[in-house]
Amino acid sequence: MNKLTFIALLIPLLASCGSVSLSQSDRDYVQTHPAPKAFDSKRTEYTCATWTPPSPPDAESHLWYRAATLIHAEGWRKNTRQAQDMITLYEAAASKGHYQAINNLYLLYTNGQGASGTLYAPQPSRARKWLHYGLDKNWAMANYWLFDALYESNAGYRYNPKLALAYLQKAVDLGVPLAQYELARIYDKRFKDYNTRELLLDCAARQGFSAAMDELSRIKRIRYGNLKESLQLMHNALRYGGEGGGEAALKLTMVYAKNKALMDKFIAIPADPVREAAYAELEKALKGTGTKSGNPFYTFPRLDEVLPLSPAKTHWKGIYSAMSKEDAAFYQNPPDTAALAADILKRGIVKKEEVYWSPRPPEPPEDDGL
């Protein structure tokens, strides 16, 4: 499960910000706050609550965040200097209360990261600091982070699956789409309750969560034979980008190919070389190739204008034509991430020694007994 890709693409809206106390890493939230209502595995009714995430506190912090995502999208292809610049940019944005930056830092610090063959070990105390910051701000998403911490023994928390599921269900009731998606998977795999699974997937899909749309598309196609709705869900998933959007683009490429391959249920749809090529371009943009990284942070809000579903006429002019004008300008003329990170350190917005992430020491050679 790649939580990082899913969470990083939630669209931020309204927010407040504030200073961060380093003492937040020293507390244990579950010992100082009452536990939420116990998880009910027999519950089958959910109201599809929605959540409006915090918006960027200012333009500068949002620029730092967006610059960090340019490096983040490189994955293992970024070098060690870029990896540190990314953390500097995220930490600077987070210091102003930028929700998306804090979200990505929590996940980086819990999972670790890699760059050019170099591994960076998890940083539990840093993850804990940002987890507690979100909880203190009453961010609904922070309940999902606490679920993750308790369920995966992250951020210095002890494994407590019962309490973890209680926080997951609380996050669902507060409208967090990733939590809705995660709980849908639990109803599917653990309880074999497919109806509740679909209800929760629909809740997340309504909020633009691409992984939920892609999964719901598969269900509509296979379980119900509803090809029209399945096709629309794939198209919608692509609009919102992310891992689900990349998977949807791959499937749509097959839908409009002469040889439908895995999407042979759509045999009645005529081959369309223009759409096939456009969806292939979008898939590479999101997922990358064997030699180039994709960018799961891309979104395509103008997709219906330039690449509507058939039989409508297309106006495709490449991936930037499907982006917002602001995004197209940003990605075609990206900022100098190294210069931004250096300026942050020069201005003392964050201190180098406080954000430096040392690489994991190399593994000792194996003793072959000779």
Residue ranges and their predicted role:
Residues N2-A8:
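Sec-dependent signal peptide recognition
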Residues C17-D85, L370:
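N-terminal leader/linker segments that initiate helical-solenoid repeat arrays
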Residues G18, E305-L370:
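Long C-terminal extensions of eukaryotic subunits of large macromolecular complexes
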Residues P57-W64, I71-G75, S95-Q100, L105, ...:
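Short helix-capping/linker turns of helical repeat alpha-solenoids
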Residues N79-T88, G117-W130, G156-Y167, R190-L200, ...:
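Structural signature of tandem alpha-helical TPR/SEL1-like repeats
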Residues C203, L231-E243, T253-A261, F266-G290:
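TPR/TPR-like (Sel1-like) alpha-helical repeat modules
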